[in-house]
Structure formats: structure tokens, C-alpha cells
Amino acid sequence: MSILDQIEVPKRGAQIITICGDAGTGKSSLAATFPKPVFIQAEKGVERIPAEIRPAALPQVVGSHKDADGNFINNTFWDQFKALIREEHDYKTLVIDSISALDRLFVSDILLQDGKANNLNSAMGGYGAGFSTLATKHQQLRKAAEMIRQKRGMNVVFIAHAEVDRVSPPDQDDYSRYSLRMTHSKSLPPYL
């Protein structure tokens, strides 16, 4: 058998994508049209999707907190994510709405875990280590998305809000630069 006899068209697999846009532009509504979606909500938004395409959604994720004994109670995001990997269901698309809101929850978690810091720059020992910890959380999320894609064959859609900067170079026309609205640029690569 020759090498060329082994050529075949690859089967289409599940996708991992990021939808980015301004508020109210229909990012969640677009994601709701994907095959059999279920939303993990880091912010409210599913209720604004037209009723005829409104998807199933898990309860809105809340931030971490400490119990009466001072034990760190993690937010439900990872619990919801793990349930979609481990438990039987017929959903075909996981939508995370939104990574911009989830980023804020991650920041709150880091500051709560540190206990002393009041900003990311001084968190986790200072010298910007909080930003690296934040970036690691986003990398873990991207790896978890790959895991659910491989193990469950699910599409994963990350919804992100856009941050628009006006750029005025001296030798060119002004233009707008769009990027994902995140706390720090180190958190962007997993979603691009």
C-alpha cells in the first residue's frame, strides 16, 4: 500500500472558539444557536436571549468566600465544569458567558486566597506574581476546555467583551483597536 493510498479527509471535530464584541451585540444569542448548548454564567445574560432560542443554563457562578472557620470555599465554576465532563448529558456545546466576568471572579479569588493584598500587583508575594497567577487560571480554563472537547466531543464557546482603544499615530489615520476585556494582557493568549 502506497503512502498516497492512505490519504483521507479528516472528520470534523468539536471546536473551541472565542466570540468577542461590544455589549448588546448578540454574542450570547449567537452562541445559543450552536448545537444543543448549555451555558455556564459568570454574568447574567441568558434571560435576554430570545425565548425561541433560549438555551439551558447552570446557575450563575458566585465568587469564592471563606466559611465561618476561615476555610476557603471555591466558587461553583469549576464544580459546574467538572460535572459537564463527568456526568451523563446530551449537551453538545458549552458556552462560558463571559470570560471577562470570569476574569473578575478569578481576581477576587486570588485576592481572597492571599488575604493581605489589595491588588494583583502585590498579591501572591508581590512583584506582579498575582498577574501570573491570574494568567495560570486562564490557562487552566483553556486546558479544561480542551479536555471537555476531547472527552465529551463538545464544542466550547468563550464569550468575551471587547475593549476598544482609540489609536492616533502621528503618521497615519486614527483607528480603533479591539481586544478582549481582561485585567491583564497575560490572560489573553488562551483565548486568541
Question: What role is predicted for each listed range?
Answer:
Residues 151-192:
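Phosphate-binding/switch region of NTP-binding enzymes
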Residues 44, 62-67, 118-122, 182-186:
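Glycine-rich loops and low-complexity Gly/Arg-rich segments
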